[in-house]
Amino acid sequence: MYPVRVEINLKTDFTDFTPENFGAYITVNEEGYKKNGTFVKLPSVMDAWGYGGVVVYISLNGYDAYDMACPNCALHGKQTSCAIDGFYAVCPDCGEKYDLASGTAAPQKGLVRETLRRLRIMPSGDKLTITQQQ
């Protein structure tokens, strides 16, 4: 399991990232923070973004967070990060699609049964902290 520790400041960096904005997302990896695909800022020294990067998505349930590594490719020894395409995280290697909008990240093509790895998301004041599940 790869460590995850990401903090999102809703007051300064992501003021419009609210539960009312269904389908909005933030990704975090070594390239930085992106909101809906647009670069926002560099990651801090304290950030750790799991195996394939982190996506925080506003689903029907509110805020959800997942590691973007494709479970199907990981079973075959590949480290492939999914790309966000609307309501789905899509693996560019195997083509599996994971449903983000429902809040389950369940695979849609049936190549694998495993969902994207869910991460813990803790709102506190104006911040969201994302870590791995215990």
Describe every region a protein language model picked out.
Residues 1-83, 117-134:
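N-terminal pre-ligand scaffold of iron-sulfur
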Residues 71, 91-92:
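Cys/His/Pro-rich metal-binding microdomains
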Residues 76, 97-100:
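Secreted/processed peptides and extracellular or luminal domains of membrane proteins
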